[in-house]
Each structure stands twice: as structure tokens, then as C-alpha cells.
Amino acid sequence: MDDINTLRRILRESRVIAVVGLSADWYRPSYFAAKYMQEHGYRVVSVNPKYGEILGEKCYPSLREIPGKVDLVDVFRKTADVMPIAEDAIAIGAKVLWQQLGVKNEAAAAKARAAGLEAVMDRCVKIEHGRLFGGLNWVGVNTHIISAKRPRWLAY
């Protein structure tokens, strides 16, 4: 998905983000992307069976065990691991399946879309939020990929 308006709408409407594969290690990309989103008003729910709590929130072993509503499922796992996560996202009634930079499972995205979810692949929620809502700066992960440019106008 490359449509700026759709990405902006997804990030504006999503308030609860379940991060699958979130690490408790501060230096991991999943941690600082989740921390950034939390600091920008999103509720971040951790999904990782290794931990009890991350970023002050209870950590769940799977998406299906999260009580309450999840708007966006953010996937920090290998491409091969995405299909069962997509199935869980469908089962819990999430609105968006978001695959992070380097994660691009077309079959999982197609399955999510067929079930009525929106699907984003190979993009970082932190980078897109910063780019689309005015927070893009020099802090981030050196992926050796320039994946984002400032839009011509900002939605303030």
C-alpha cells in the first residue's frame, strides 16, 4: 500500500496496536517503534510469549489472548511466520494487518484483505507516523533504505 491518504487514515483511526514479536530489549527496532507509538498516544499491547510485561503493559503469548479490541496488528516476525498471525488478526476482529520493513507475505495480506482487513506490507509504523504527522527526524534505524519522503502537506 503506497497511498498516503490511506496510510494517514489508518494511523489516525487506529488507537490500539498489538505488536507481535515485540522485544523488551531497548535497542531492538520493535521496542523503539512501539515506544514511539506509545509516546504518541497509542495503546501498545505486547505479544510475545517470552515476557510478562513490556513498556508498562502486560504481554500476551498470542493475539487471541488479548482481552478487548485491537485496531492494528503490527508484525515484527519473519515473513514465513505471518500467515498464522494474519489468521489470528482476522479471528480477533482487527482492522489492519501491518507487516514491518522487510516483512512481505502476499498470501497473508490477501487473506486479511479477503476477510475485510486492510493490509500494509514492508513499512514501519514509526517511520510512517513521523512522515505523515510531522515527526520525521534523524532518529531511527539505519535500514540502508530510504523508504519515506515527507508528503507535500502535513495533516496538522
Enumerate the language-model features and the residues they cover:
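Conserved beta-strand elements of the Class I
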Residues: 17-20
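NAD(P)-binding Rossmann-fold cofactor-contacting core
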Residues: 23-27, 35-54
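Rossmann-fold NAD(P)-binding glycine/threonine-rich loop
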Residues: 101-126
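Mid-chain, well-packed structural core segment of small domains
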Residues: 70-106
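A short helix->loop->beta-strand "cap" motif at the edges of active sites that frequently abuts
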Residues: 40-42, 92-97, 115-117
